[in-house]
C-alpha cells in the first residue's frame, strides 16, 4: 500500500510540475510620465516587460480625450504624452505598447452612458493608436456600481472592439 501511495504521489507531482512548467506568462509594466521623468522607472525594468502600458488617457463627456501631463509634479523631462512614448521606445525595443483606459479620472460614467460619445471615444482612441503606432489598449474599469453602469460599460467595450477591429490588442 505504501508503494502505491508513493507512485500516486509522484504521478500527481510529475503531472502538476509538467502543467506548471507549460504555463505561459507575461510581464506588463505601467509607465507613468511623472515617474519616468524622475528616474523612478529603470530602463532595465522596462526591457524585462513583454508589454508597456502607458497611463493615462481620460475621456471627456462628449468622447473627446484628455491626456495626463507627463511633467506633472515636477518641471523636467518629456513634455508631452507623445514625447513620453517616443522616449521610452528609443530605449526599449521589441515590446508591445498599449494605452491604459482606466477610470481613475475623467468623465467615464457620462461618456459610456451616451451612444454618440462612445462612438466618438472609440474613434478617437483608434486615431491615437494609429498616430502613435501603438499595439492596443488596456481596459481597467473598476467603478461600475449598478446594473445600468455595467450595461453602459459593456456597450462601450463592444463599441471599442467594433471600431478597433481585430488588429489591436484588447
Regions found by a protein language model. Give the residues of each.
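Active-site groove signature of glycoside hydrolases
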Residues: 125-150
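Glycan-recognition patch characteristic of GH18 chitinases/ENGases
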Residues: 22-129
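Short acidic, glycine/proline-enriched helix-loop-strand junctions
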Residues: 71, 75, 148, 166-168
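Residues that line or immediately flank small-molecule/substrate-binding pockets and catalytic motifs
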Residues: 11, 56, 141-143
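Short, solvent-exposed loop/turn segments at secondary-structure boundaries
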Residues: 111-115, 147-152
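Active-site neighborhood of glycoside hydrolase catalytic domains
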Residues: 150-170
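Bacterial Sec-dependent N-terminal signal peptides
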Residues: 1-22
Amino acid at each position: 500500500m505504501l508503494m502505491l501511495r508513493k507512485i500516486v504521489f509522484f504521478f500527481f507531482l510529475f503531472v502538476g510540475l509538467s502543467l506548471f512548467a507549460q504555463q505561459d506568462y507575461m510581464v506588463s509594466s505601467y509607465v507613468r510620465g511623472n515617474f519616468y521623468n524622475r528616474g523612478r522607472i529603470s530602463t532595465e525594468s522596462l526591457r524585462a516587460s513583454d508589454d508597456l502600458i502607458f497611463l493615462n488617457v481620460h475621456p471627456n463627456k462628449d468622447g473627446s480625450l484628455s491626456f495626463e501631463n507627463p511633467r506633472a509634479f515636477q518641471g523636467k523631462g518629456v513634455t508631452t504624452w507623445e514625447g513620453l512614448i517616443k522616449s521610452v521606445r528609443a530605449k526599449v525595443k521589441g515590446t508591445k505598447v498599449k494605452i491604459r483606459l482606466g477610470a481613475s479620472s475623467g468623465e467615464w460614467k457620462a461618456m459610456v452612458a451616451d451612444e454618440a460619445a462612445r462612438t466618438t471615444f472609440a474613434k478617437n482612441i483608434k486615431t491615437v493608436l494609429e498616430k502613435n503606432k501603438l499595439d492596443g489598449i488596456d481596459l481597467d474599469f473598476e467603478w461600475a456600481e449598478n446594473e445600468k453602469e455595467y450595461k453602459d460599460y459593456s456597450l462601450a467595450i463592444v463599441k471599442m472592439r467594433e471600431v478597433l477591429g481585430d488588429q489591436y490588442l484588447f
